[in-house]
Amino acid sequence: MAMIEVEHLQKNFVKTVKEPGLKGALRSFIHPEKQTFEAVKDLTFEVPKGQILGFIGANGAGKSTTIKMLTGILKPTSGFCRINGKIPQDNRQDYVKDIGVVFGQRTQLWWDLALQETYTVLKEIYDVPDSLFHKRMDFLNEVLDLKDFIKDPVRTLSLGQRMRADIAASLLHNPKVLFLDEPTIGLDVSVKDNIRRAITQINQEEETTILLTTHDLSDIEQLCDRIFMIDKGQEIFDGTVSQLKETFGKMKTLSFELLPGQNHLVSHYEGFSDMSIDRQGNSLNIEFDSSRYQSADIIKQTLSDFEIRDLKMVDTDIEDIIRRFYRKEL
């Protein structure tokens, strides 16, 4: 059985359309015009136990609404979601013991309490037995390296320390599923790497199923087994990072370093179209569709125009592919 099951999930919001001016405001008050907005449209997917799923999309795509339904905050208009065999909205008090949630821009920690005291409070909230609590704290201390600041008040923690502390708080009760919303937002490179290593270790050692939403595509490449991308509430891609690159990463770039003193313009490339050619000084970059053109033909044409010192092939990275998705270029 899948750890996360989503079938024909739909969420509609009804909003009132307000007309401008005093008359419009009065008319809207007496006879309000209602419009239905479909935030999530017929989503269906499954996440097996132990998988890290990158759940991505542009702002307004429906990610947050979907997460709120999966965590039991919102009730679906139709369809259903089931986490570890439980429907989130049916018995939230029991259900939340199966999940952990981390929001990068919000904290679940108590600002004025020392971090250790916060975990003690959470132990009581989640009804964690003493023996399990000490075992979990030993594990989380080791993985997330909390020992240097665990006695400090939460308000004194740096952003990176607070994020590690939040992840530990969400894992204290040993949840089956972890929802991570922008876990590395605002962090520097080294701290991001530490957070990613910790998430990977937790996933591998405990088989925790993780649903990750992020705009940092390095998180996706380094952490996720699979990508589920939505736009306007609908699925537009479901597959691995390599499948995404294979399907949509057909654009490649040949980057040439020219010998100095060649100031003439690039000649017309006979038989080629839809290529982007960028010449700056001794650098020449040619972007082309590898499903239509052979790189050898482009290199041959370029060698007939210029003397080349060096060249390299650059594949389209995941960030560029998803950027094109957002711009509706794919």
List each model region and its residues.
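Conserved ABC transporter NBD signature motif
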Residues: 79-90, 95-96
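Conserved ABC ATPase "signature" region
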Residues: 21-29, 120, 124, 131-149
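ABC transporter nucleotide-binding domain
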Residues: 196-289
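Conserved ABC ATPase signature
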Residues: 112, 153-157
